[in-house]
């Protein structure tokens, strides 16, 4: 029985065979050239060919050098343009907004006892770690501002809370995280609905945190240029009261009564004191504009 592969073998096409034969003839013809004739031909054509090759190479080299010089000049011009156009300053408020937009959680406001804001912030951060709710409670902030206080003729720069009695908390609100925040010492509750508080909007939180961001950006820019920090408009407070002072209440339900100051809170601009009512001393909280020093 014959092999089908052998029977099905295809005869090579005539064109392909002739092409291969032509290529073989060329190779054989090259091999059959007389060495003396080849050498003579090389000598006859060698010098002009080498000269032409040198000229071509020289022309190519000149063109390459010219192109390289043009590229360098273009780079120099581009560099000059970049130096001539300083980078546009970054708007710190816009940068803050972009950063806040990408952060996890929502911002809530909690109410604290006056003067306990920083203590509440520290306690809350510690409790978030110890009670394993770091994945829900991310950040606590007490916005501050710099003011000038004048007391007994002495001028002093101090930082005080911008929102006395309040702390900002960035968190995911769950039953567990709500309980940790609400039961932090010094916290009296969430602002708004006590059990289902509403978060601040992006515009609201930006407005609260923007002044500090602007101050920081201005300070860093001045330091980078080796200049002093720019002067800022600050509030001036004149403190005429001291613990132990006897004052007269000028406004409110205790007007005309005498009080003795036992605590002063410059941040909230309030004092705590004792007012004698029906022969008994009663603790009260009064604002600076409700009392007058005797």
Swiss-Prot record:
GO cellular component entries: cytosol
GO biological process: DNA-templated transcription termination; regulation of DNA-templated transcription elongation; transcription antitermination; transcription elongation-coupled chromatin remodeling
Residue segments, region Disordered: 1-91
CDD domains registered for this protein in UniProt: KOW_NusG, NGN_Bact_1
Residue ranges, compositional bias (Low complexity): 40-53
Pfam families for the chain: NusG
Record field: compositional bias (Acidic residues): 25-39, 59-85
UniProt keywords, alphabetically: Transcription, Transcription antitermination, Transcription regulation, Transcription termination
Role, per record: Participates in transcription elongation, termination and antitermination.
Family to which this protein belongs: Belongs to the NusG family.
Listed name of the protein: Transcription termination/antitermination protein NusG
Gene name of the encoded protein: nusG
